[in-house]
C-alpha cells in the first residue's frame, strides 16, 4: 500500500519544483507589453522542430500539448515523462543603434499514462505567456529647443499554466479531449523619467480550459490522413495590483494597490490536417487568436 501513496506525493513535489524552474522570462519582444504578454507558441519538444505545429498529430511516444485529444497513442504499459528547455537569440537594429540578446532556460515538464483502455491522462506545467522588453524614448521639451526628456520603459515576468489533460478514444479513429488547469504569474512594468520611477506589479491568475477533437480517416495504402480541431474560450484574468512611485530628487514615495482594466485570455481556434507515411510526416495548422477584449497592461 505504501507504494501507491508515494506516487501522488512525488507528483506534487515534481510540480512544485518544476514551476520554480520554468518561472523565468522567455521573451524580449516590445509587443509583450500588451495584454497578458507574448504567448508561448508551443511547449517545445518534438513539435518545436516542425514549426510548433501538430494539432492533427497523434503518434506513439508523442505527448501532444497542442491538442488534448491527440494523446491516445501513448504507450499503455508505462508512464511517459517529458522535460524540455528552450533558447532564443534576437538582434535589433534602428538607424545606427544595434542590440542583441540571448535567452534560454528549462521551460516545461509533463507526465502521461493510460488510465483505462480508452482513457488517457497527462499532467504538466509550461509557460503560457512572457513579458520582457526595454524601450527608451527621447522627446524634445516644448519651448526649450535642444533640451530633451528621456523615458525608459521596462517589463518582465510572465504567466505559467499547470494543466490536467483527459482524452477519450470514442472509437478506433475518433478521440476527444479536454485540458483543465490554472494560469498564474506576476508581471512587473516600470516607467522611469529623469529621477521619477513608477512601477506596476500585477499578480495574475485565471482558470484555463481548452477542448480538442482528433479524427483519423479510413485510408488504404501507406498514406494515413488525420485532422484535428481545438478551441479555447476567452476567460477573465484576476489581478492583485500594486503601484510604487519614487522620486530621488524630492524623496517622495507612494506604495498602494490600484485597479486596472479587466484583462482576458484570448479566444483560440485551431485546426490541422496531417499525412504520414513510413518515412514522411506532412502537416499544416491554422490558428486564430482573438485579442479584441484586451488593452495594454498599463491600463
For each feature predicted by the language model, list its residue ranges.
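A generic structural signal for short, non-catalytic loop/turn and secondary-structure boundary residues
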Residues: 14-16, 43, 74-76, 222
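Outer-membrane beta-barrel translocator/receptor signature
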Residues: 57-136, 158
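Bacterial Sec-dependent N-terminal signal peptides
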Residues: 1-28
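Generic structural "secondary-structure junction" signal
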Residues: 41, 52-57, 73, 239
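Short coil-to-helix leader/linker segments, especially the first N-terminal amphipathic alpha-helix
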Residues: 6, 14-16, 55-63
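Outer-membrane beta-barrel porins/channels
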Residues: 24-49, 94, 110, 114-299
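Residue-level detector of alpha-helical transmembrane segments in integral membrane proteins
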Residues: 1-2, 61, 259-260
Amino acid at each position: 500500500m505504501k507504494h501507491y501513496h508515494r506516487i501522488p506525493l512525488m507528483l506534487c513535489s515534481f510540480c512544485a519544483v518544476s514551476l520554480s524552474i520554468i518561472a523565468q522570462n522567455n521573451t524580449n519582444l516590445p509587443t509583450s507589453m500588451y495584454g497578458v504578454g507574448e504567448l508561448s507558441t508551443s511547449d517545445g519538444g518534438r513539435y518545436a522542430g516542425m514549426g510548433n505545429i501538430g494539432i492533427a498529430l497523434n503518434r506513439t511516444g508523442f505527448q501532444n500539448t497542442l491538442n488534448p485529444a491527440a494523446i491516445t497513442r501513448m504507450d499503455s504499459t508505462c508512464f511517459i515523462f517529458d522535460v524540455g528547455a528552450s533558447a532564443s537569440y534576437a538582434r535589433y537594429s534602428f538607424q545606427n543603434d544595434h542590440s542583441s540578446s540571448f535567452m534560454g532556460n528549462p521551460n516545461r515538464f509533463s507526465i502521461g499514462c493510460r488510465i483505462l483502455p480508452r482513457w488517457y491522462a497527462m499532467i504538466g506545467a509550461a509557460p503560457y505567456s512572457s513579458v520582457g522588453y526595454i524601450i527608451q524614448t527621447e522627446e524634445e521639451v516644448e519651448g526649450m529647443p535642444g533640451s530633451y526628456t528621456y523615458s525608459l520603459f521596462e517589463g518582465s515576468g510572465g504567466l505559467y499554466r499547470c494543466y490536467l489533460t483527459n482524452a477519450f478514444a470514442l472509437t478506433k479513429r475518433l478521440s476527444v479531449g479536454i485540458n483543465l488547469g490554472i494560469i498564474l504569474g506576476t508581471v512587473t512594468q516600470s516607467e522611469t523619467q529623469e529621477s521619477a520611477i513608477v512601477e506596476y506589479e500585477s499578480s495574475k491568475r485565471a482558470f484555463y480550459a481548452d477542448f480538442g477533437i482528433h479524427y483519423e480517416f479510413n485510408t488504404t495504402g501507406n498514406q494515413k490522413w488525420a485532422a484535428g480541431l481545438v478551441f479555447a474560450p476567452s476567460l477573465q484574468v484576476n489581478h492583485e495590483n500594486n503601484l510604487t512611485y519614487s522620486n530621488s530628487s524630492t524623496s517622495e514615495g507612494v506604495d498602494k494597490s490600484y485597479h486596472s482594466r479587466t484583462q482576458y485570455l484570448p479566444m483560440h481556434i485551431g485546426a490541422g490536417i496531417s499525412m504520414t507515411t513510413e518515412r514522411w510526416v506532412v502537416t499544416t495548422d491554422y490558428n486564430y487568436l482573438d485579442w479584441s477584449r484586451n488593452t495594454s497592461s498599463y491600463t
